[in-house]
């Protein structure tokens, strides 16, 4: 077993300083990190425990009417918080669709943002071809088992998908990630937080070395009355999405004022279906228009030999999610 040192950070500045040491990583709930360590995928030499930093485990209202969710808020607490349930039911649904109750009780919002892919070739170090684990080694999934892999935004270097349900909802809601690092504090628009693989699939996010996620900000609630998170998976119990859809609408009678649609399980990052949104904005919500919008969302899909079904599955999921969102009257069941 590798030797690992441990340090408990007392504040954000101390955590950032400690993270400058080679091989240091932050640990909150640790639900994903421990899996990676046990499998030999992650080999940190120093763990920086951030769970005792005050002020990162609260949900607060912002002056503009939005909310701030601290990075250390547990997934279960975020999902069941009154402000989230009432004003951002889409996020509550997505959080409750992820993992198991036990994992949600331990996992943090900040850690959820940093989940690594669940690609089997990434997790099994017996497979030496994995550009995400070892850049330049190849991608075993391209010619292997790729039923669960990406159909949008992939590259010849990597076809893995992002596994986070929460992140799909945050993408649709135009969240902002707050971070603190050696150069100070900054914010990252959610659309810019996760990366497509390109030629560096080992880099999942746009975080700079040593930066710590401190919170996620949500804009004022515009979609509390009409939103829905739909997750399609192989079994009803704990499973990652084959396809998921976060749909959020502002409705004026039968007309869509504003549509926000994000997809999960189809790309290296939560995928905003901008083409579908544009086709729905300002239009009456007819089924013909909705089906055309769903087709537009997948027009650039490039499926692999085992996951061609995902294209039609995603289109149908968009139709279902948007129809459900349009009929919804707010809140979480």
Indicate residue ranges for each PLM-predicted region.
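C-terminal structural segment of proteins
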Residues: 1-333
